[in-house]
């Protein structure tokens, strides 16, 4: 009789994306239960190391989003504890989460990305800004469009300044790219499809991402064939260059007025509910339903993930 592995679903955590993480965790738990895995949900807190030692899972399914969850922190802890885990490893997670580092990677791969730079809170409040309207102000290490400000006019800037609590000490400011929002899924080292998003709001914000009916999903994206092909090529190129594992999602903006495509970011831990983009693309392109997608991620992580044995690490004397 085959042993069924114990799987710890890590969700919750400390970030602003906690609620979304809990939703992802519950969706994964439901899928794993239906697949007859032994699954337990763990709400990640400061005692996570002790919880993992007590649970001793064969695999940790990372359903965390945002800081500490997809930036290499939890991955590093799992490496130290010798526990296999899903999604990307430490370095890929850390670099992809940092929008400044990501831009350097995109440039090195000759992939266009919006012009931008790191700006201090002080310079934002003094309006010492070197980018013309419209522009985008966003955190360096956040996801789900949390803390993102679309500034189309001086009136928008004044509103931001009057509600300055969301302006962090260091942020990234970018030119605004008008046009079409695109998301490309990579699964098992293959770019499987690109979806177009048409939000009901001005942009694809937190509400539009996680509220049914606030955005229209168009598949395949209604863009020129050559642009569609380039989204697939760029998403796979970045996925492979960073060393991403199993699954990732790359985000783009396409401006049909001047036929330019800009890569915004790569997400190593994309949202993972049945309404999320990667599961939807997998279903539409490969006929893979949510439960099967969860199984693919679990099996790939169990059988193709090597955790370094501490005994193999070279000792320094």
Curated annotation (Swiss-Prot):
Mg(2+) 1 binds at residues 251, 265. Residues 103-299 form the ATP-grasp domain. The gene is ddl. GO terms for cellular component: cytoplasm. This is D-alanine--D-alanine ligase. It is found in: Cytoplasm. The keyword Nucleotide-binding applies. Belongs to the D-alanine--D-alanine ligase family. It is an enzyme of class 6 (ligase). It catalyses: 2 D-alanine + ATP = D-alanyl-D-alanine + ADP + phosphate + H(+). One of its GO terms (molecular function) is D-alanine-D-alanine ligase activity. Its EC number is 6.3.2.4. Mg(2+) 2 binds at residues 265, 267.
């Amino acid at each position: 009789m085959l042993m069924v592995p114990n799987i710890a679903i890590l969700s919750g955590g400390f970030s602003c994306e906690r609620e979304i993480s809990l939703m992802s965790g519950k969706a994964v738990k439901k899928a794993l239960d239906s697949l007859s895995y032994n699954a337990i949900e763990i709400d990640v807190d400061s005692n996570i190391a002790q919880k993992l030692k007590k649970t001793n899972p064969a695999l940790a399914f990372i359903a965390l989003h945002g800081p500490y969850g997809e930036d290499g922190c939890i991955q590093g802890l799992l490496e130290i504890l010798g526990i296999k885990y899903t999604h990307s490893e430490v370095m890929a997670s850390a670099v992809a989460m940092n929008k400044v580092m990501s831009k350097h990677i995109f440039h090195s791969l000759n992939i266009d990305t919006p012009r931008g730079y790191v700006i201090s809170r002080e310079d934002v409040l003094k309006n010492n800004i070197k980018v013309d309207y419209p522009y985008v102000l966003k955190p360096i290490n956040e996801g789900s469009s949390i803390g993102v400000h679309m500034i189309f006019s001086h009136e928008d800037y004044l509103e931001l300044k009057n509600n300055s609590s969301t302006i962090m000490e260091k942020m990234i400011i970018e030119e605004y790219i008008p046009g079409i929002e695109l998301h490309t899924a990579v699964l098992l080292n293959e770019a499987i499809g690109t979806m177009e998003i048409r939000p009901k709001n001005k942009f694809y914000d937190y509400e539009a991402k996680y509220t049914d009916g606030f955005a229209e999903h168009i598949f395949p994206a209604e863009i020129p064939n050559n642009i569609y092909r380039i989204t697939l090529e760029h998403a796979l190129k970045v996925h492979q260059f960073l060393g991403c594992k199993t699954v990732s999602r790359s985000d783009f903006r396409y401006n049909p007025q001047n036929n330019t495509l800009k890569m915004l970011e790569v997400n190593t831990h994309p949202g993972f509910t049945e309404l999320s983009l990667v599961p939807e693309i997998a279903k539409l392109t490969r006929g893979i339903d949510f439960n099967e997608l969860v199984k693919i991620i679990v099996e790939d992580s169990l059988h193709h993930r090597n955790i370094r044995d501490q005994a193999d690490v070279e000792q320094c004397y």
